[in-house]
Amino acid sequence: MRILILFFCFWGSQLFADEHFLEQENFEAWQFACVEEQSQKLCDLRELVFDSNTNEVVSYLSITINPEALTQMQIAFPHAVNLKSPVQLQIDDKDPLELGYAYCNQSACFIAEIIAENFINMFKEGNQLTLKVLLLDNREATISYSLAGFTAGYNRLNLAVNG
């Protein structure tokens, strides 16, 4: 969890200026990147979802592998979400899963989960990940992530972290 929080703390900061990137590569909808922070190499695989009207980021999904070789998933949402209502996550036509929010900071509210191999395989085999969230005004919002390029991107992340 500490790595997820640390990662988000520098995700939106100046540390992502070009001179801090050690590696960066695009895999269709996904972007793999490694940065150096306090002499430590931090890598993630992420996808951003933009508002079609404003072109602002409304959500992002980040995958990291922690020092214990566990895969972590973090999803960021705007503050306008109802924290008491779980998020429904669905990959293609599979049964939806309910996930709870882990925390909020000044930038966003987050789901943070350790995900198992079977869940990673659903990402690899899937085409689209859909999130349904309840907003504070009780409207439901749907956020869709493409899974195109996830397998190649995850393999690249695994290689960077585990050699």
Segments the model singles out, each with a brief description of its role:
Residues I3-S13:
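Sec-dependent N-terminal signal peptides
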Residues A17-G163:
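A generic "folded-domain core" signal
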